[in-house]
């Protein structure tokens, strides 16, 4: 069993719980019109979690909401808001219709770190092109369903409609059905911050933005201020111990002896000494 196979059940369970239906597309298959888009569907088969799949970044739920899988973590910068804005912008769905799922290796690919406030700069462009490609394919599907050329269709709030008849429409949720697109993106073969996997779609021109750049309230601020937010230091698992490194006063120094009796008063504490590494672990943290 490879790593991808191991990850697949967790991702499937997550999507099933949220009613999510995955969208994936790539540049390798020609989408001349509706028939080509229809032929790319693979009913009941979930694509693997790899950087060359659009399903690794975007999922459209049955109710029309969107899950955006972002392979970075938010360390307080509020990048989830920016990513949700970018995805909502490209897909033409409301901001509140997008949920950003971050930093879970079972549901997202490795997009590197987010230090130095570079999370949006280095990772946002991938979610942007992924959302743009998902929109393009959904419009192709709508063109087939409505019997109208794709260039005559527009999207408002996740509803695809003709330019002349608003009533002649279909929602993203209705279009996806329970089927997966299973086509590869044009991945550059890199992981981490350099990862880039665009499709055929061109993202919007910034002059057409309606959501990106707007002031949006961060819902995570109040829980952080009132100590209701769980940080990584708050994580507790069964049998967990706490560790601390013992650092030398001079760089490059090597320990030659250790007085382990100095921690005998701490229940369960023990020394970890491996050549130049010295640390201590215990069941509790003594401040």
Spans of model-derived segments:
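Cofactor-binding beta-sheet edge motifs in enzyme active sites
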Residues: 2-31, 36-287
């Amino acid at each position: 069993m490879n790593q991808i196979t191991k990850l697949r059940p967790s991702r499937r369970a997550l999507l099933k719980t949220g009613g999510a239906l995955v969208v994936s597309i790539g540049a390798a298959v020609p989408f001349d019109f509706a028939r080509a888009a229809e032929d790319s569907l693979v009913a009941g088969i979930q694509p693997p979690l790899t950087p060359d799949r659009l399903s690794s970044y975007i999922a459209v739920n049955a109710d029309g909401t969107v899950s955006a899988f972002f392979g970075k973590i938010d360390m307080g910068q509020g990048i989830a808001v920016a990513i949700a804005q970018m995805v909502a912008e490209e897909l033409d769905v409301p901001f509140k219709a997008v949920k950003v799922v971050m930093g879970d290796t079972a549901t997202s690919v490795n997009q590197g770190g987010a230090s130095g406030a570079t999370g949006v700069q280095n990772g946002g462009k991938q979610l942007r092109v992924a959302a743009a490609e998902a929109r393009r394919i959904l419009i192709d599907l709508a063109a087939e369903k409505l019997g109208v050329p794709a260039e005559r269709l527009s999207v408002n709030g996740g509803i695809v409609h003709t330019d002349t008849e608003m009533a002649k429409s279909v929602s993203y949720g209705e279009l996806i059905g329970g089927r997966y697109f299973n086509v590869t993106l044009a991945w550059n073969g890199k992981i981490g911050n350099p990862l880039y996997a665009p499709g055929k779609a061109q993202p919007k021109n910034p002059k057409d933005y309606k959501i990106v750049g707007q002031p949006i309230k961060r819902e995570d601020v109040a829980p952080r201020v009132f100590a209701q937010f769980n940080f990584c230091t708050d994580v507790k698992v069964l049998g967990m111990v706490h560790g601390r490194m013992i650092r030398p006063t001079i760089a490059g120094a090597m320990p030659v002896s250790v007085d382990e009796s100095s921690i005998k008063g701490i229940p369960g504490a023990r020394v970890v000494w491996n050549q130049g590494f010295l640390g201590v672990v215990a069941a509790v943290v003594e401040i």
